Regions:
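A short helix-to-beta-strand connector/capping loop
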Residues: 2-10, 79-81
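ADP-ribose/adenylate-binding Rossmann-like module
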Residues: 36, 45-65
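C-terminal catalytic/substrate-binding lobe primarily of soluble NAD(P)-dependent oxidoreductases
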Residues: 80, 103-272
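General beta-strand structural signal in soluble alpha/beta enzymes
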Residues: 57, 83-85, 115
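Gly/Ser/Thr-rich loops at beta-strand to alpha-helix junctions
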Residues: 62-64, 88-95
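Structural motif
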Residues: 28-29, 54, 264
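Conserved Rossmann-fold cofactor-binding substructure of NAD(P)-dependent oxidoreductases
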Residues: 10-29, 33-40
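Rossmann-fold NAD(P)-binding glycine/threonine-rich loop
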Residues: 41, 59-81
Length: 272
């Protein structure tokens, strides 16, 4: 990408704060793709905020997003630096799809949007480690805390969604946190008392049981050191899917938006 855009390379060690600070002053925007962000992300954010440099990442780790917001939001505002989290699969499709759906619902309050996710893909080593960390630290109170959440959630348990012909399983991901912050920033689009919930969409009841069991097993395994280490060793950082695997990857999010007098259905889809 730097070669295509004719950009210079700037190299800096994330474990060297002085080097990071000097490098950040030489650019306007830093795009960091090195996860897990709970291990490697904060020094870059800190250096960017101090230098007044914008910082964009691909994190899907709720605890990291919450930590950065609590500790760097006000310093970033003071230094006119933008911190833009979750600009990958987490959470661009969900955030943009919810925004578009809210626009179609028109003016008014009490809007609710549910999204249903179908996807096929392979984790890279870094993404796998980030996901394990996110499951380990996942806290419902942290993500849905009204202090940081805009509106009231209307999560359902596992249920049949007739409008898409699939079963829905709640997703413990960062997307609702990101969507809720967008809603708080754009009250003109989302209105008051906005809610957003996100689910896996699966075709058969047996797949529902498999998805629920899989999530439960991973959450339990991340709390047991020996099992957690086995998960971490499954794939090393820097090891990603092959081109053939990426060519077969896809995602689709279906959004059901409701207001007091209107219901709309939209979708966002794509490949790797």
């Amino acid at each position: 990408l730097p070669e295509l855009l004719e950009l210079d390379h700037i190299n800096a060690d994330t474990d060297n704060p002085d080097a990071l600070e000097k490098k950040k002053k030489s650019t306007k925007l830093v795009i960091t793709t090195v996860g897990p962000y709970q291990l490697h992300g904060e020094p870059i954010v800190k250096a960017c905020v101090q230098a007044g440099t914008h910082c964009l990442d691909l994190t899907g780790e709720p605890k990291f997003v919450e930590h950065i917001y609590k500790h760097y939001n006000f310093p970033a505002e003071r230094n006119q630096a933008l911190i833009i989290n979750s600009c990958g699969f987490d959470s661009v499709p969900a955030d943009m799809g919810a925004f578009f759906t809210a626009q179609l619902l028109g003016e008014g309050d009490n809007k609710s949007i549910q999204s249903y996710v179908s996807a096929k893909g392979t984790f890279s080593g870094g993404t796998l480690k980030s996901a394990i960390g996110a499951f380990e630290d996942f806290s419902e109170e942290m993500i849905w805390d009204p202090k940081y959440k805009f509106g009231t959630e209307t999560f359902e348990g596992i249920h049949r969604q007739k409008s898409i012909g699939k079963w829905a399983v709640p997703m413990p991901v960062v997307d609702p946190l990101i969507v809720s912050r967008s809603a708080r920033a754009r009250n003109d689009i989302y209105g008051n008392d906005f809610s957003y919930a996100q689910y896996f969409a699966v075709k058969q009841p047996l797949m529902v049981a498999g998805a629920f069991l899989g999530i439960s097993v991973i959450m339990i395994a991340t709390q047991i050191p020996i099992l957690k280490q086995q998960l971490l060793n499954y794939k090393v950082s820097g090891q990603g899917p092959s081109k053939e695997e990426r060519d077969k990857s896809f995602f689709k999010l279906v959004f059901i938006g409701k207001s007091s007098n209107k219901t709309v259905k939209t979708s966002v889809s794509g490949g790797d």
